[in-house]
A protein has these predicted regions:
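N-terminal, intrinsically disordered, polar/charged segments of Gram-positive cell-envelope systems
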Residues: 245-266
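Short, glycine/acidic-rich hinge or "gate" loops at secondary-structure transitions
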Residues: 109-118
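P-loop NTPase catalytic phosphate-binding loop
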Residues: 1-110, 126-198, 202-206, 212-241, ...
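Short basic/glycine-enriched coil/helix segment immediately N-terminal to the Walker B
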Residues: 117-126
Length: 272
């Protein structure tokens, strides 16, 4: 986890090695998989681990919970700009992210650097995480901003983490899909959906938590960490504030035998 700007604990591969990737290097992220594939647990584990290992001055999250089911445990955390349940409330927050990217772009030009991480005091990384982004496909204003983040967000410290159960041929625009180069997919129902996810091997997966990781064009089978809501809530509660306004901060189930717990990983990590 050390030395990485946005460390993503993906899972253990067949050699027994834990794959920890830096999203700042791997670019924007797409997670896919059918119900029961382990996708929700993986997202929960990724968000929780980043909150535990990074300060609010280092990373901020904008969360879209379009199924009303996944991100409630992240409310009132100093790392979280807000949790938004529908397109109407999400749009103005994404518009503010777009304005912040523009501000940061001007700052980079003024300072003659290519990335915010080259600045002496960089602003926090912004991670826009939207569960079931497919529900926004008919919202052109939102999708335009999401695509813009995918194109220019990296140098400005803004990243996408998008999830959906499965795709169809028109679910994501070509430009956006091409920019989601960091991919993890659980079980897909058929070869068509596996192909659209970009990971053809995902149709052959038959175990909960078994997924295909693709980075820099290379695929490998991994077993992703297990993190249920109760455990995540217990880890996060000490960080919560009594009250938190949901406005964006802008500067000026039982474990199965083949699953492993992120709690064990966190307990072994040095604090600080």
């Amino acid at each position: 986890m050390k030395g990485k700007i946005i460390p993503i604990m993906c899972g253990v591969d067949r050699s027994g090695m834990m794959n920890v990737k830096d999203m700042a290097e791997e670019h924007h992220m797409l997670l896919t998989g059918t119900t029961g594939s382990g996708k929700s647990s993986l997202i929960r584990g990724i968000l929780t681990s980043l909150i535990l290992h990074k300060s609010p001055d280092e990373i901020q999250f904008l969360l879209g919970d379009l199924k009303f089911s996944e991100f409630g445990i992240y409310k009132r955390l100093p790392h979280v700009m807000g949790v938004y349940m529908d397109a109407q409330s999400l749009l103005p927050q994404l518009q503010m992210v777009a304005k912040e990217m523009e501000r940061r772009g001007k700052l980079l030009d003024k300072m003659d650097v290519e990335s915010i991480y080259e600045l002496e005091n960089p602003p926090p990384t912004i991670v826009v995480c939207i569960d079931e982004v497919i529900l926004l496909k008919d919202k052109p204003k939102i999708m335009k901003i999401i695509e813009s983040i995918s194109c220019i967000g990296r140098s400005n410290g803004a990243y996408l983490m998008l999830s959906m159960q499965r795709g169809d041929a028109k679910s994501l625009g070509g430009q956006l899909k091409n920019n989601l180069t960091f991919r993890i997919s659980g079980k897909q129902l058929d070869e068509t959906n596996a192909k659209i996810s970009g990971l053809k091997q995902s149709v052959d997966l038959d175990t909960a938590g078994r997924m295909i990781l693709s980075t820099q064009g290379k695929e490998r089978v991994i077993q992703v960490p297990y993190m249920d809501k109760k455990k995540a809530k217990g880890l996060l509660d000490p960080f919560k504030t009594k009250q938190k306004s949901e406005t964006i901060k802008i500067e000026d189930e039982d474990k199965k035998a083949n699953e492993f717990s992120l709690v064990e990983v966190f307990e072994d990590e040095p604090k600080g």
